[in-house]
Curated annotation (Swiss-Prot):
Protein topology in the membrane: Peripheral membrane protein
Residues that coordinate or bind ATP: 35-42
EC identifiers of the protein: 7.3.2.3
Subcellular location: Cell inner membrane
Entry GO MF terms: ABC-type sulfate transporter activity; ABC-type thiosulfate transporter activity; ATP binding; ATP hydrolysis activity
InterPro entries in the cross-refs: AAA+_ATPase, ABC_SmlMolc_Importer, ABC_transporter-like_ATP-bd, ABC_transporter-like_CS, P-loop_NTPase, Sulph_transpt1, TOBE-like
A GO cellular component entry from the record: ATP-binding cassette (ABC) transporter complex
UniProt catalytic activity: sulfate(out) + ATP + H2O = sulfate(in) + ADP + phosphate + H(+); thiosulfate(out) + ATP + H2O = thiosulfate(in) + ADP + phosphate + H(+)
Role description: Part of the ABC transporter complex CysAWTP involved in sulfate/thiosulfate import. Responsible for energy coupling to the transport system.
Protein known as: Sulfate/thiosulfate import ATP-binding protein CysA
CDD domains: ABC_CysA_sulfate_importer
Species this protein is from: Vibrio vulnificus (strain CMCP6)
Assembly mode: The complex is composed of two ATP-binding proteins (CysA), two transmembrane proteins (CysT and CysW) and a solute-binding protein (CysP).
Length: 345
């Protein structure tokens, strides 16, 4: 089922959570709403779900206007960050809850409920825990139960609000892989909110980057990372170093957003930490830096250095097999040449 959002505005007092947001989410896609805290991503999800009413604008599911309907009438499944499982119910009873709570005319019989719940528990690989209680499960297992419960009512769309935010890094990575596999089996239209760029890049078919209540860019993970349309997207998705173009031949760092040099307006340009060529010998066309720290991070080494021109921090990432690392120690001077840059006016 596709989702159409048109002209959504939402205010909380003087704060603008959504500012005239319009977007269509394709049927069967897994879409990440990505952005910093307060950008509007959770407000957008809650308005689509019917948990919040917009000040203006409409929400349609499969071209049917649902703006005036509450969450039960919209046929959406919603998964919260903190599970929201009933502690006094078994895992089986938690998953069955939505089915048993349906109006009598639409409520399945107990045999059908049992069959559906058992099938869902098998799908999320927790059928062997059906008689346990939430307190007896790990955080990752509880989140899978919450997802099974959301799927039990056969929703038209699935909405997830930072579903892995309360879990540790290793469990998050396992569940991201599991969610992607599950979606490929079910093909249900799904939106998930996250502030974790790695999570969005790894899991989603498409990413919607939001900032200050508006959409900055929509694209595939590769498009968002490789061809950011705005300065905000470049800075938010992936690590970056800010530079400015002094003239046609030279690059230099600056702490300012816009710099005028010799009467010329400098462009703001950026370089990823892994896109520097590192030289241990002086080069007149390179950026001179002094190494402050050398950090071993698994298969990568990160250098924290400071520009000799203005003391701006520069991050450089190298493979831990790079031979130049043997020559690099703290306080060592290096010369950096950007191999690839992105420019913004």
């Amino acid at each position: 089922m596709s989702i159409q959002v048109s002209g959504l505005c939402k205010h909380f007092g003087q704060f603008t959570a959504l500012n005239n947001v319009s977007i269509e989410f394709p049927s069967g896609g897994l879409v990440a709403l990505l952005g910093p805290s307060g950008c509007g991503k959770t407000s957008l999800l809650r308005v689509i779900a019917g948990l919040e009413r917009p000040d203006s604008g409409t929400v349609a599911i499969q071209n049917r206007d649902v703006s005036g309907l509450d969450i039960r009438e919209r046929q959406v499944g919603f998964v919260f960050q903190h599970y929201a499982l009933f502690r006094h119910m078994t895992i089986f009873e938690n998953v069955a809850f939505g089915l048993r709570a349906k109006p009598k005319a639409r409520r399945p019989n107990e045999a059908t409920i049992k069959q559906k719940v058992n099938r869902l528990l098998q799908l999320v690989q927790l059928d062997w825990l059906a008689d346990r209680y939430p307190a007896q499960l790990s955080g990752g297992q509880r989140q899978r139960v919450a997802l099974a419960r959301a799927l039990a009512i056969e929703p038209q769309v699935l909405l997830l609000d930072e579903p892995f935010g309360a879990l540790d890094a290793k469990v998050r990575k396992e569940l991201r892989r599991w969610l992607r596999k599950l979606h490929d089996e079910l093909h249900i239209t799904s939106l998930f909110v996250t502030h974790d760029q790695e999570e969005a890049l790894e899991v989603a078919d498409h990413i919607v980057v939001m900032n200050k209540g508006q959409i900055e860019q929509i694209g595939t993970p590769e498009e968002i990372y490789r061809t950011p349309r705005t300065e905000f997207v470049y800075q938010f998705v992936g690590s970056s170093n800010r530079l400015y173009l002094e003239d046609s031949n030279g690059l230099s760092f600056t702490p300012s957003d816009v710099v005028s040099t010799h009467g010329k307006q400098a462009k703001r340009i950026y370089c990823r930490p892994h896109d520097f060529a590192v030289n241990t010998q002086h080069r007149p066309d390179a950026i001179p830096v002094a190494v402050a720290r050398k950090l071993a991070l698994g298969n990568m080494v990160r250098l924290e250095a400071y520009s000799l021109d203005n003391q701006q921090l520069v991050e450089v990432e190298l493979s831990n097999h790079d031979p130049v690392l043997d020559e690099i120690q703290a306080k060592r001077h290096l010369w950096l040449t950007p191999k690839t840059v992105s420019q913004f006016a």
